[in-house]
Every structure is written in structure tokens, then in C-alpha cells.
């Protein structure tokens, strides 16, 4: 995962997509618990991916990537 994160930080969209695929089930579970409605869940996951992609260079510790994305997801859920 570490090398994918570095590639994604360098702008590799395929690496970023692979990272998201690796954690998609966890993102879905967290969002589903908070929102219940599948349409809202998918909207929030999409917004999370956009936000994470735009902010990826701000991630200071690559080992916390999944935690960082889940925190973004929770913040997005709170907007609903």
C-alpha cells in the first residue's frame, strides 16, 4: 500500500483508484451505519474520494492513509 500511496501523491490516478478499491468495503460499512440510505452512502463515498484525491499531498504519514480517508468520510457524512 505504501508504494501506491506515494504514486498517488505524485498524481498517479490508477494508483489512487487501486487504493480506493482496497478500502471501499470499509468506507461503505462506515457510511451505511451513519446514513442508512444507499443513495446517500454512494454520494458520500464519491465526495470522500474527490476530497481525498484533492488533499492527498497533505497526508503526512502514509501509514494512516485508511484512517485519514475514513475521517474524511465521517466528515462528509456529517454534512448530510
Task: State each model region's role.
Residues 34, 38, 55, 62-63, ...:
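Short coil/turn segments at alpha/beta junctions that flank glycine-rich nucleotide-binding fingerprints
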Residues 40-44, 60, 64, 68:
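Alpha-helix N-cap and coil->helix boundary residues
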Amino acid at each position: 500500500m505504501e508504494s501506491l500511496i506515494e504514486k498517488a501523491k505524485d498524481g498517479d490516478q490508477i494508483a489512487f483508484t487501486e487504493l480506493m478499491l482496497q478500502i471501499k468495503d470499509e468506507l461503505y460499512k462506515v457510511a451505511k451505519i451513519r446514513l442508512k440510505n444507499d443513495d446517500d452512502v454512494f454520494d458520500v463515498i464519491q465526495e470522500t474520494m474527490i476530497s481525498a484525491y484533492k488533499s492527498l499531498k497533505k497526508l503526512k504519514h502514509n501509514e494512516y492513509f485508511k484512517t485519514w480517508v475514513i475521517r474524511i468520510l465521517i466528515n462528509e457524512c456529517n454534512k448530510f
